[in-house]
Amino acid sequence: MQLPRELKYAAIAGGVALFGLIFGWVLFPTILKSQLKKEMALSKKTDVRKMWEKIPFALDFKVYIFYFTNAEEVQKGATPILKEIGPYHFDEWKEKVEVEDHEEDDTITYKKRDVFYFNPEMSAPGLTGEEIVVIPHIFMLGMALTVARDKPAMLNMIGKAMNGIFDDPPDIFLRVKVLDILFRGMIINCARTEFAPKATCTALKKEGVSGLVLEPNNQFRFSIFGTRNNTIDPHVITVKRGITNVMDVGQVVAVDGKTEQTIWRDTCNEFQGTDGTVFPPFVPETERIESFSTDLCRTFKPWYQKKTSYRGIKTNRYIANIGDFANDPELNCYCSKPDTCPPKGLMDLAPCMKAPMYVSLPHFLDSDPALLTKVKGLNPDVTQHGIEIDYEPITGTPMVAKQRIQFNIQLLKTDKLDLFKDLSGDIVPLFWIDEGLSLNKTFVNMLKHQLFIPKRVVGVLRWWMVSFGSLGAVIGIVFHFRDHIMRLAVSGDTKVSKVIPEVEEQKDISVIGQAQEPAKVNI
């Protein structure tokens, strides 16, 4: 039996509407999700894997240094007056080396290598890196703080060692060129033959102090970041590839072959989160994104703040802070003991980096207000000093990331060392870094063309197919049954009643109105 032409058109239009409904709301999201699962995994053939192994553009690495303008007074116990100098801008290139895949457990191992190049054009106007700054002597203070904490009975010997190693310093401050203290290094004189300096230098060499490089003739060179520059990090990191389960992509499962740390207490020793360079897709804003920092030996869990956009792509902004270890049960295990936590907003780096320093947000943002009363010259601002990530939730791509961390040290006060007896004992800032990532136009456009433009086209097309298909089906049905509809309109069961005007009873004209005789008037 052949369908009438109008019903054929209606069937075709209805099919278009049904296809638009099924494809637009069922098939396409399923296909997209399946494709993303393949693309976001760290398999060898994906673009994500290539970018994960070697980021094809430089990150912004900015350093701000606090100049102690009243060092002589601080030596006598006065409140430090600080002047922030910066940024000193460095181009940071990141790559993963010695990469090995392990099919049996869907993991991948690697080591890190970072390379820094000073960029004077992107630094603050006039800064060359040759400026001389006055800051607390990080190495000298570090030695004193470590001995005071671990072997206080040896403080007297350390005092003699300092006089030999640092040539009888007049105070605990360092006057040094910026690039020397950051990368090039400053000489630590270990050529002295006296017992105290020699014994101390032998211990330094044995311990392998962070930032220290052995030079010829028993000299050491110390810098903050120099040992990281163009050097392969010794730690072997193991993460999930996400081929078996894409939601596990980038998850840290071991460092140096160990599946947990031994430096904290309880759950703080667990590896939670990704390595910070890749995140799983399809994360709802109600969930936190987690990343494990091998530099700080801890997990950060940024939380959702608000909707944002970057170069036309919708993103979710997540923010983070250091935390309040004393009052947050989840973070209390980062304290050496439950009741010996640092002030809010500070984290002790000694267990992780072997360095007696504290990290915080810059300018003590979101920290114990008492910290701001110990120094002058700080102005915390959430827009300039906060940690934030603009995260594309479908692919899990960080579009913009700003990791800002400040390094602080305690001005140790002790009567056993002449240079330290009048110090305040307060925690003061040394410098802070702003490590930033912003996807450039090339990679944003690539993301748009591979994902968002097809998604928008399908979004428009599905509504067009459903709307016009439904309309076409209705019109076809109406045209097919139009004659029948018209007949129903005119014949049907409805009867037409004949209206017969009512005939009124004839009346004589006299009945209509009786003549009235005029009233007689007597004159």
UniProtKB/Swiss-Prot annotation:
Q: List the disulfide bonds.
A: 268-333, 297-352, 335-341
Q: What is its main location?
A: membrane
Return the InterPro entries for the record.
Answer: CD36_fam (IPR002159)
UniProt keyword annotation of Cytoplasm present: no
Residue ranges annotated as Cytoplasmic topological domain: 1-11, 480-523
TM regions (residue ranges): 12-32, 459-479
Listed under GO biological process in this entry are: sensory perception of smell
* Topological domain spans for side Extracellular: 33-458
Q: How does it sit in the membrane?
A: Multi-pass membrane protein
Cellular-component GO terms for this entry: cytoplasm; plasma membrane
User: Recorded GO terms, molecular function?
Assistant: scavenger receptor activity
Entry annotated with the keyword Disulfide bond: yes
Alphabetically ordered keywords of this record: Cell membrane, Disulfide bond, Glycoprotein, Membrane, Olfaction, Receptor, Sensory transduction, Transmembrane, Transmembrane helix
Protein's cellular compartments: Cell membrane
Per the UniProt entry, the glycosylated residues are 229, 440
Protein family per UniProt: Belongs to the CD36 family.
Biological role stated in the UniProt entry: Plays an olfactory role that is not restricted to pheromone sensitivity.
Q: What is this protein called?
A: Sensory neuron membrane protein 1
Q: Where does this protein come from, organism-wise? A: Helicoverpa assulta
